[in-house]
Each structure stands twice: as structure tokens, then as C-alpha cells.
């Protein structure tokens, strides 16, 4: 993305404040963390040994002087296109190892302890180049396992205007397994999700092969019929990617891709629950139909997140505006993309639907962990990674005070002031 020259200084300043740029994280020995359990607000003591939760004990009260912070598993974001001035798949942004570090450290500050860098429809050579960088960084010690794999949103999506969103028509293609395998190898076999349009030629065979390799298939940016959607789910598609987005502005009232994806109980959905991507009514209806057990809250966030409000030029050459309240839009007022971190979606779905904090955390942590087979995280249980967040709910906003990744305190709001 083409962004203002001061962004580089802004990002550097972030990490001087956060203090991680050159720090090596290593968690050895035993430690204890106190907080109010997110499920029932009861005081707890969590014991950690070498980054793993070894004990969870309810307490009558928190120790004297301990702040009353809610404790929950770290958030897991399955669709991060970029963050804090870093883009994972933009033709006018060079992705570097330091860029991946910077984005990860910034996400930690927002309570995200695990995320899938997302590569959208683009030049295959750019995708390969960026996957090489990401695959190399995936296992870097200082990132503490925060990147378990990647999400490919395309290029196997609908070429029809509206359904393809901002994706370049030039690079959209039908699913071809041999070409995907080449990309898969560049990722060091770490692609965890592919989002595709099931109506494309060869899609069902492709879904079968993804399932055989443990790659989650999402349905998105498509205009498939109810029959095709049902067939795709039968073949192994598991989630509707950012439901309600990737639709044409004008769709038939009764015959469109939305209803069959909502009505199929076999299909999970992900929702972008910022205040701009979906209406409150959409969020309420989607939640009431699918429930907390079949929903993933995602951010679909872009590299504009955390940048100063102002006017920017998108990779497509459009003038866009990041407003004071965090809306990322075209100058005509239409939403361009998301610039809100996942924690904002957690707070917003609670505000809009009346769901509990426990339900919101399930959708933003537990469910994505289960979806991708990340059995070591997503809940607070003995034997799991100590990926934890401590926070306050202030006027329906989620204020992160501390973030632990594998038992390491990687963000502390007090020490960052």
C-alpha cells in the first residue's frame, strides 16, 4: 500500500514504546498469574511452568494490591491482511522479516496471540515471494509460535464484479491442484485455509484434495447456488468466510448465496464484527442463526490498522480515508476494508447481540483453535500454552492491560506508558 512517509516513524515509535524489537523472549521456571476468569468472573490463580499452564486454582479473593483484571485465552485471528503499516500481500509494499515482526508485536498489544497472515488474490510471483518470507518467520523463536500457518483468500474466487470485492480480476483463476501444490510448498506446507468460490470449474475435486491434506476450505467471494453450496459442504468445505462481505451490492431477495450458507448447520461462519463491515442487524441475525458454537469472529484487518487518520492511496490506486473513529472507506463513503483489531469485534458483538463475554471469547479464540486443529491453545486449561490476556471492559470497550504468549509477558500497558 502507498502510505504517508511518516508511517515508518510511527511504526518504529510503536515498538520503542512496546520495547520488543531486539528482545529475546524465553520463559523458564514457574510463575503465577492472578485474574478474574472470563467465564464467571471468579478470582483464579494460574500457574505456568516453561510456558505451559500447569495449574488453575479458584481463590476466595485476589491478593491484596492485585488489579481486578479479567483473564482469558489470547485471541486468535484467522484473517489478517496486514497490520500497523505492514501488508502481507500488496504489490506496492515490500514484505520483510522485520515487517512480520512489527505486525506481530503490534497485534500482541491488541490481545491477538495467534493469527493467520492472509494473502489475497494477486500476482503469483508476489504470493510466492511473500510466502517465502512468512514461512521463514513462522518458526522464528521471538514470535513464540504466534503464526501457525497462513490463509489464502483466492485466487479461486468469482470474477464477477461485486462478488470479487477489491480483488484484481487479472489474477483470478479456477482452482488447479498442481499450481496450488507449488504455492503450498513455498509456504512450507503451512497453508491452513483456502477461501474459494465453489461454483468454479474443478472446485469440488479441489475441496476433496484440500480436506485430505488438512487444509480448511472456506467459501467466500462467490455467487454459488444453494445446490452448489450444499455440495461443497458435503465435499468438505467447513466455513463461510466473512459472511455478508464479498457480495454484490444488489442481490436477489430470495436467491442469493447468503441464505443457504446461513441455513446449513454443517457450515461455520466467520464474521467481521467491527462497526462498519456489517450492520448491527446482520450481526444479530447471523449470531442468532449460528450461535456461539458455530461462529468465528474475525477482523479481516488491513495494514492501515493503527495508522493515523487521514487520506491514503490504496494498492488499487483509489483514494481512501481512515476516519477518526476507525472507519476505512472510499471518499464516497463506501467501506473499503477493515482497520479495527479483533478485540473491537469482540466488544461490538457483545454490545450488538447481548452475548456474554464467555461466548465472545469462544468465537474469537476457542472456535478458531478447533477449526485449525490448534489443540494447544484457545482455552485456559492445564497442559495448554499460556497464551493469555488480562483486560478491562470499559464502557463496552475491551482494554488490554497485559498479553502473555507462551508464558512470556510480551505487552504490559503500564510499562509501555
Where are these regions (language model features)?
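His/Asp/Glu-enriched, well-ordered alpha-helical/loop segment
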Residues: 259-269, 287-299, 305-391
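Active-site core of metal-dependent hydrolases
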Residues: 177, 181, 185-309
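Conserved phosphate-binding/catalytic loop of the ribokinase/pfkB sugar-kinase fold
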Residues: 158-188
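N-terminal metal-binding scaffold of metallo-dependent hydrolase/deaminase domains
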Residues: 2, 6, 11, 25-61, ...
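Bacterial N-terminal signal peptides
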Residues: 13-24
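Divalent metal-dependent hydrolysis catalytic cores, especially in the metallo-beta-lactamase
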Residues: 81-84, 89, 101-133, 145-158, ...
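C-terminal cap of metal-dependent C-N hydrolases
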Residues: 380-417
Amino acid at each position: 500500500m502507498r502510505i504517508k512517509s511518516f508511517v515508518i516513524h510511527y511504526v518504529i515509535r510503536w515498538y520503542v514504546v512496546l520495547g520488543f524489537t531486539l528482545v529475546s523472549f524465553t520463559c523458564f521456571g514457574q510463575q503465577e498469574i492472578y485474574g478474574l476468569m472470563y467465564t464467571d468472573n471468579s478470582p483464579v490463580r494460574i500457574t505456568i511452568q516453561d510456558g505451559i499452564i500447569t495449574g488453575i486454582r479458584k481463590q476466595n479473593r485476589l491478593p491484596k494490591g492485585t488489579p481486578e483484571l479479567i483473564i482469558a485465552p489470547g485471541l486468535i485471528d484467522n484473517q489478517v491482511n496486514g497490520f500497523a503499516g505492514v501488508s502481507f500481500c500488496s504489490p506496492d509494499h515490500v514484505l520483510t522479516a522485520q515487517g512480520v515482526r512489527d505486525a506481530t508485536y503490534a497485534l500482541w498489544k491488541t490481545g491477538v496471540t495467534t493469527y493467520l497472515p492472509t494473502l489475497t488474490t494477486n500476482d503469483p510471483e508476489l504470493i510466492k515471494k511473500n510466502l517465502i518470507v512468512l514461512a521463514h518467520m513462522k518458526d522464528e523463536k521471538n514470535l513464540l509460535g504466534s503464526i501457525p500457518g497462513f490463509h489464502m483468500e483466492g485466487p479461486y474466487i468469482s470474477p464477477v464484479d461485486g462478488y470479487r470485492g477489491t480483488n484484481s480480476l487479472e489474477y483470478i483463476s479456477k482452482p488447479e491442484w498442481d499450481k496450488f501444490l507449488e504455492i503450498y510448498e513455498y509456504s512450507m506446507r503451512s497453508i491452513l485455509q483456502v477461501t474459494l468460490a465453489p461454483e468454479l470449474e474443478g472446485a469440488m475435486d479441489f475441496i476433496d484434495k484440500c480436506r485430505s491434506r488438512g487444509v480448511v476450505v472456506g467459501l467466500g467471494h462467490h455467487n454459488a447456488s444453494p445446490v452448489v453450496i450444499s455440495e461443497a459442504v458435503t465435499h468438505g468445505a467447513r466455513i463461510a468466510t466473512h459472511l455478508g462481505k464479498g457480495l454484490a451490492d444488489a442481490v436477489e431477495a430470495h436467491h442469493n448465496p447468503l441464505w443457504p450458507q446461513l441455513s446449513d448447520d454443517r457450515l461455520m461462519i466467520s464474521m467481521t464484527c467491527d462497526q462498519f463491515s456489517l450492520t448491527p442487524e446482520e450481526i444479530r441475525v447471523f449470531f442468532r442463526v449460528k450461535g456461539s458454537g458455530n461462529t468465528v469472529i474475525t477482523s479481516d484487518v488491513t495494514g492501515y490498522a493503527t495508522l493515523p487518520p487521514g487520506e491514503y492511496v490504496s494498492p488499487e490506486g483509489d483514494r481512501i480515508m481512515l476516519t477518526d473513529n476507525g472507519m476505512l472507506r472510499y471518499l464516497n463513503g463506501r467501506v473499503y476494508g477493515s482497520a479495527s483489531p479483533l478485540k473491537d469485534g469482540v466488544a461490538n458483538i457483545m454490545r450488538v447481540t447481548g452475548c456474554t463475554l464467555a461466548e465472545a471469547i469462544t468465537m474469537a479464540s476457542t472456535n478458531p483453535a478447533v477449526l485449525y486443529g490448534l489443540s494447544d491453545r484457545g482455552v485456559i486449561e492445564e497442559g495448554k500454552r499460556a497464551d493469555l490476556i488480562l483486560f478491562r471492559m470499559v464502557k463496552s470497550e475491551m482494554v488490554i492491560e497485559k498479553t502473555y504468549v507462551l508464558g512470556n509477558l510480551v505487552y504490559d500497558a503500564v510499562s509501555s506508558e
